[in-house]
């Protein structure tokens, strides 16, 4: 080892001796600057001076890396102290002929915190609940000048000095609706303005708070209680009092079938509407679910829907088209658990089948046989109907009501001859006079003398034919005058006869009363006898 290696211990020894046994002389050691504040890892120039002109020894004692700057003279030295990581008190010392002395400079290191961190917030926070904010700060100096601030946006919630390592500051916030979407953060303030420097701030990463309100009441679910296979139903789920309603998630499902609702939002409510289709695979009792999820909470409503299969009843005719007089069997069959009624069947215990026997008549043509089936599903009565029509083939018919046998019309008047033939199939009708002259049935004609006569109306179809004679009488104007004269004479004679009768009757009554008065016989009042 080099002989000079133990020499650094000498100044330290001199410093110690000078401090313990200061010399009797007037020599003094001074240091400049006496106080310094500098950033961590920084450098500073320290000047050590002594009052004697020829000091035996002049230097600085410090664990810091140092570099002496050469200056003229023997009583002053300048040192560059570098990489200052923490507070330090370098000491200048001198040894003069008249004594030893020392002087200290105070180095204060400042640095901003290495970590400023706000504890993560819950993803959702219910309105009306307390939220605890927690900020941790590691490092930073000088601690006497370091403050921790909790913020909502730019609003201060709490301010405390940084104490401990790591320093921790907490506060509690009562969550409100208007806190939704607010940013919370933590900030440190290293205030060195009194030392002639500036205010150093460090801010944590912000966290955005999401608040919510989910009422304790379950959602309202409106749906059919029963649903038929291969049909569609509508499901509506709604809930009021939500915040923020746009963040609410709605899940609708029938059994394992997820529904796709259309959601309509109000100020603090929503309504979700969905169509549901069911098949034979869904038959039975299924669970309908409406779940509303908001934040980290949910509300759910369950209902049961009964899926059923109920085909319309089957109406069976022996033949849909029969001839008159044919025996016809009408059957009605439905679901095994259904109860059916068939019109025309007398009252009887209801079951899944009903039957009717009849002999086809013309009146049965076009007759509808209606079968009504009723099935009870989950306490509800479901009704289905089916109708079949019977066609009866029968021969033509011509009767007085629809084809009068005698028409009397004034000459030159407008008339429409009407004659309706009935039958199935509808027969062809022709009315001919003398086998050649047709009567224009259903057409408006001017009545002439040629129209007068007897016509043979023939109705013909595949089921046979029928004939009927009709007579057309045409009245000429001269016959009308005769008729009017006869009628007028009859009216006059009738009036004269009635007048003569009334006159003779009054005369006889007067004569009778006169005779009675002459005999002195009182006349009995013509009063009604009193009943016993």
Swiss-Prot record:
A motif (Cell attachment site) lies at residues 152-154. The chain crosses the membrane at residues 481-503. SMART domains: IG. The modification Phosphothreonine is found at residues 521, 530. Keywords: Cell adhesion, Disulfide bond, Glycoprotein, Host cell receptor for virus entry, Host-virus interaction, Immunoglobulin domain, Membrane, Phosphoprotein, Receptor, Repeat, Signal, Transmembrane, Transmembrane helix, Ubl conjugation. Monoubiquitinated, which is promoted by MARCH9 and leads to endocytosis. It is a single-pass type I membrane protein. InterPro entries: ICAM, ICAM1_3_5_D2, ICAM_N, ICAM_VCAM, ICAM_VCAM_N, Ig-like_dom_sf, Ig-like_fold, Ig_sub. The keyword Protein biosynthesis does not apply. Homodimer. Interacts with MUC1 and promotes cell aggregation in epithelial cells. Interacts with ARHGEF26/SGEF. Interacts (on T cell side) with CD81, CD247 and CD9 at immunological synapses between antigen-presenting cells and T cells. (Microbial infection) Interacts with major receptor group rhinovirus A-B capsid proteins. This is Intercellular adhesion molecule 1. It comes from Homo sapiens.
